[in-house]
């Protein structure tokens, strides 16, 4: 009986007590897993008393005093409040502009309804003695078609850390991104999609995976470019790094450089000039979030090698406690240094986006928003009530990953978001959009649901937790329009039924990748069948490059690292690839982007040329070509499921970013794309 009460509580909390796997088989989530997920939501369920208390917390109340702090609405449409009422209720609406209106909340099907409001923004609704934020969004995000009607744009995707720039110290930076944007814009490109730039760990350079951030509110100073901020060349020792990045060595060199720049800033004329004033404004604008991030960075450096904050003494685990305040007061210059790093990073990104737009790009830089954050990071420490401590994000078992996946990330608590007016979600969106022309939302399904795993459990022992997707999509649309940012949702793999349609209706562009565009009749879907609303690409950072796929080297690498799937014979996979090669080549020939007999596995140049032209011929509003494919490289940036055994996130471009586009093969491929998709 108690287990059934737990299941009922879980359902009411938005936890799916059953789920279907990739084969359609149903699974029931065990009560211990449900209890762990409930506990992370602030709904303990281990005893009868806890169950009763948690059930009371979920009991819906319908009085005005129980309204949440923020309610979303769509411009031009009335909005039902979760408040009962049979008579009209007078209210005062204060628009974001300051205009005040007197409105009536009218009853509709037993609930009060806010009349339609045309103006988008964060307005205030006052009813009796209760005031809430009414976030009125446009119906859709800003789309590529809003930027350029009937668009057929093209752009590049690049791993920021891998860009090569004469002034870097072995890790790609935003000066390299600016160089690439300037060169690509001159050739007709309208966008550059970059790998995540989120803050990692200044004191722990061994943790360099860009999708496992310490905080998504701040940036990784390793990508900062002081020359973009100070307008002068900063003397650095030339980097000898080629091929693979040595993150600890390069990080040490970069932070040594940034420390020198900081000290010169404090002692020089800039401190009392416009740049000093700009730094002061930035610190004021970012407020407590920046201060706490700087405290965390300084504390972690002092606590190393005890790097995980949950292992720190109890008084240091409280970001608002006396011990942390005492530490910060005793290290004022160190706190200021970490705030300076964020200011330089922020202004570097702003400058790089400005260069992209001045180069003629209609979109410019597209940032990447990771699905979650490291539970041992800055955000988790400073805003513990925001997140699902004790749970990690992953994926249930599937054909390629029969044991499931644990990404060692955590995310926002949907209950905490709703109770707190979605402040952390909005802050994350605003940080991602501040200096971007577009954002890519990694694992966009996380807007609707996440697979959550209790820490210490296997990935298969998880559960789906539903999120307030309608609210999140409205807030995403509002911030997108306010920032003039287009939104791309990574919607690959298995997603809930209707999710693709939901994204499309919200103006979010999905992703179409060559390897997944299959057709039972012809093998591969022709370009005209790729639709007209998504973003097309040859591959992604987690998938084989065109040359690697054609040669079959991706099969060898996955087999070497045990990533083919349990019990999968590599010879079977190789034979399937032998059958797929002519299917892909024939698709190219039918579209007149390839000709002649099927190339041999090691004849990759013609195949890469054809793939790039094939993607360019699609009718989607934006085609993105990874630099790895423009260069004809075999190696992919990341092999999912591996950490140190494969050189993930370490590959460098063989030459400066802007010079890459001038090489014969790259120039030829860009010519194909620019001819098919000329800038209008």
Where are these regions (language model features)?
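Carbohydrate-interacting/catalytic domains
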Residues: 1-194, 230-237, 473, 481-486, ...
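Acidic/aromatic-lined carbohydrate-recognition and catalytic surfaces
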Residues: 39-76, 92-111, 115-127, 133-382
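Alpha-amylase-like alpha-glycosidases and glucanotransferases acting on alpha-linked glucans and related
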Residues: 203-346, 372-622, 628-629, 644-645, ...
């Amino acid at each position: 009986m108690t287990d059934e009460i737990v299941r009922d509580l879980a359902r009411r909390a938005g936890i799916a007590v059953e789920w279907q796997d990739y084969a359609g088989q149903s699974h029931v989530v065990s009560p211990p897993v449900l209890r762990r997920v409930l506990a992370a939501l602030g709904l303990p369920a281990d005893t009868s008393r806890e169950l009763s208390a948690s059930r009371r917390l979920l009991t819906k109340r319908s009085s005005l005093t129980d309204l949440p702090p923020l309610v979303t609405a769509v411009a031009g449409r009335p909005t039902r409040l979760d408040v009962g009422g049979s008579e009209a209720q007078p209210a005062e609406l204060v628009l974001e502009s300051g205009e005040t209106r007197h409105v009536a909340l009218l009853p509709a099907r037993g609930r009060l309804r806010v009349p339609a409001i045309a103006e988008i923004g964060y307005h205030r609704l006052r009813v009796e003695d209760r005031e809430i934020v009414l976030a009125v969004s446009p119906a859709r995000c800003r789309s590529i078609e809003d930027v350029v009607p009937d668009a057929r744009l093209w752009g590049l995707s690049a791993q920021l850390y891998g860009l090569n720039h004469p002034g870097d110290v072995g890790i790609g930076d935003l000066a390299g991104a600016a160089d690439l944007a300037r060169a690509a814009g001159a050739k007709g490109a309208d966008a550059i999609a970059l790998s995540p730039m989120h803050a990692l760990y200044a004191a722990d350079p061994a943790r360099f995976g860009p999708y496992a951030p310490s905080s998504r509110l701040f940036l990784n100073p390793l990508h900062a470019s002081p020359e973009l901020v100070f307008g002068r060349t900063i003397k650095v020792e030339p980097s000898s790094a080629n091929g693979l990045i040595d993150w600890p060595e390069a990080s040490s060199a970069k932070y040594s450089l940034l420390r020198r720049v900081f000290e010169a800033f404090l002692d020089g004329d800039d401190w009392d000039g416009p740049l000093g004033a700009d730094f002061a404004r930035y610190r004021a604008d970012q407020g407590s979030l920046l201060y706490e991030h700087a405290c965390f960075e300084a504390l972690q450096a002092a606590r190393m090698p005890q790097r995980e904050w949950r292992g720190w003494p109890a008084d240091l685990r409280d970001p608002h406690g006396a011990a942390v305040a005492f530490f910060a007061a005793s290290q004022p210059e160190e706190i200021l240094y970490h705030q300076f790093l964020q200011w330089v990073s922020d202004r570097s990104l702003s400058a790089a986006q400005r260069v992209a737009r001045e180069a003629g790009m209609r979109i410019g830089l597209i940032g990447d928003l990771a699905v979650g954050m490291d539970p041992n990071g800055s955000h988790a420490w400073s805003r513990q009530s925001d997140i699902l401590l004790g749970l990690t994000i992953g994926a249930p078992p599937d054909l390629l990953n029969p044991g499931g996946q644990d990404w060692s990330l955590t995310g926002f608590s949907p209950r905490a978001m709703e109770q707190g007016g979605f402040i952390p979600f909005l802050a994350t969106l605003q940080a991602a959009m501040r200096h971007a022309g577009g954002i890519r939302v990694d694992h966009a399904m996380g807007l609707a649901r996440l697979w959550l795993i209790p820490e210490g459990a296997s990935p298969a022992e998880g559960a789906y937790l539903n999120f307030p997707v309608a609210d999140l999509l409205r807030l995403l649309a509002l911030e997108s329009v306010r920032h003039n940012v287009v939104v791309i949702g990574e919607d690959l793999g298995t997603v809930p039924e209707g999710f693709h349609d939901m994204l499309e209706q919200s103006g979010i562009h999905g992703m179409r990748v060559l390897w997944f565009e299959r057709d039972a009749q012809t093998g591969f879907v022709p370009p005209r069948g790729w639709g007209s609303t998504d973003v097309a690409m040859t591959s992604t950072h987690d998938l084989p490059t065109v040359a690697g796929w054609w040669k079959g080297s991706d099969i060898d690498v996955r087999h070497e690292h045990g990533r083919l799937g349990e019990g999968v014979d590599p010879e079977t996979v190789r034979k399937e690839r032998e059958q797929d090669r002519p299917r892909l080549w024939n698709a190219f020939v039918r579209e007149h982007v390839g000709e002649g007999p099927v190339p041999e596995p090691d004849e990759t140049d013609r195949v890469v040329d054809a793939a790039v032209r094939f993607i360019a011929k699609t009718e989607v509003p934006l085609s993105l070509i990874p630099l790895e494919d423009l260069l004809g490289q075999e190696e992919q940036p990341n092999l999912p499921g591996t950490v140190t055994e494969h050189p993930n996130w370490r590959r460098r471009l063989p030459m400066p970013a802007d010079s890459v586009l001038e090489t014969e093969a790259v120039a030829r491929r860009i010519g194909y794309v620019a001819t098919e998709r000329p800038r209008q």
